[in-house]
Design a protein with these regions (language model features):
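Early extracytoplasmic/lumenal segment of secretory-pathway proteins
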Residues: 1-27
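Ligand-binding "clamshell"
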Residues: 29-36, 58-62, 173-185, 247-250
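Short beta-strand->loop
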Residues: 35-46, 64, 179-191, 200-203
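A conserved helix-loop-strand patch within extracytoplasmic ligand-binding domains
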Residues: 41-101
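A bilobed periplasmic-binding-protein/Venus flytrap-type ligand-binding module shared by bacterial periplasmic
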Residues: 73-80, 114-118, 193-208, 216, ...
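Ligand-binding pocket segment of bilobal, Venus flytrap-like solute-binding proteins
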Residues: 101-105, 109, 113, 121-186
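Mature extracytoplasmic/periplasmic domains
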Residues: 200-261
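Conserved C-terminal helix/tail region of periplasmic/extracytoplasmic solute-binding proteins
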Residues: 256-295
Length: 295
């Protein structure tokens, strides 16, 4: 997201179509980097489910067409972890010391700690951000987690870890490959994200961008993309064509009671970002079991 944003901002007119996530769409709308969409030219928009429209980052759905969505959750090896995995608390359980993998991501790892502490993943309250920091510092003492990038997709299959944070698409794909691996969205909720197709405000080929968005939003296209990538589709017609074990998987298409506890990231004000940055610096400086921690 951040690399895409910088390229669009510093090279106006170079890119016609971009695929930002929710919070980045909010930021780009505020900075007039996105063009309003003429839905008369995108008839396949009718197939996008109502649950994915008019969300906080684009409340009138003028700028974005949902493309793919997912969650952050937990993947674990059920042949080695036999207790029910229903809560984020398990990532703080000392009996899994040296087995836990966490994201090398300020926002994602602090989000899990905020959820565990009972707060919003978009908290702007200093005491709540401090509480999340303290949760991760305590986790460091209890389980000495490994921080890295996408290690969850390799460490669990290789038997190097028993339980990891992971994005839903990767988690569900690994579950398909190994029946002992289980992906779950904890009962407390998680980050629910949406990647969308957007047209830049300086696009030179708006017609081509509209045609591509309409093509991707077609039922058959959306179905092929979802099957290939493994993430859940916002296309209600495509979902109906997915195998029953996919469309009825509660950890892919979550039940309402879990979905209601999930949150989309918002673009944080600069002063709040600084609070998150400072918390992350303290977490990084305390953690020796890491692979180049990053923002």
């Amino acid at each position: 997201n951040e690399i895409m944003y910088q390229k669009v901002k510093t090279n106006p007119g170079t890119y016609d179509l971009v695929v930002p996530s929710d919070y980045m769409i909010e930021k780009m709308i505020q900075e007039d980097l996105l063009e309003t969409i003429d839905y008369n030219n995108i008839p396949n928009y009718q197939y996008i489910g109502e649950n994915y429209k008019n969300l906080s980052y684009d409340p009138t759905n003028e700028y974005s067409v949902p493309y793919m969505w997912g969650t952050i959750g937990i993947i674990y090896d059920s042949s080695r972890i036999t207790e029910p995995v229903t809560s984020w608390d398990i990532l703080w359980d000392s009996k899994y010391k040296d087995e836990v993998y966490m994201f090398n991501s300020l926002r994602d790892s602090l989000a899990i700690a905020l959820i565990k502490a009972g707060y919003s993943i978009n908290s702007d309250v200093p005491s709540e951000i401090d509480a999340a920091k303290d949760e991760l510092l305590e986790q460091r003492k209890l389980v000495d987690p490994i921080y890295g990038v996408d290690n969850g997709t390799t460490m669990i299959p290789a038997g190097e870890s028993d339980i990891n944070m992971i994005w839903s698409g990767e988690g569900l794909n690994l579950q398909d490959e190994n029946p002992n691996l289980v992906y779950v969205v904890p009962k407390e909720g998680a980050n629910f994200w949406i990647d969308s197709l957007c047209i830049t405000s300086n696009a030179k080929n708006v017609e081509g961008a509209e045609k591509f968005i309409n093509f991707v939003s077609d039922k058959e296209s959306a179905l092929r993309i979802a099957d290939e990538i493994g993430y859940t589709t916002p296309n209600k017609e495509a979902r109906l064509e997915q195998p029953e074990e996919v469309r009825n998987n509660p950890n892919a298409y979550m039940p309402k009671e879990i979905m209601d506890r999930c949150e989309i990231y918002t673009d944080l004000p600069k002063d709040v970002k600084k609070l998150y940055d400072n918390a992350w610096i303290q977490i990084k400086s305390s953690n020796q079991n890491e692979e180049g921690l990053d923002n």
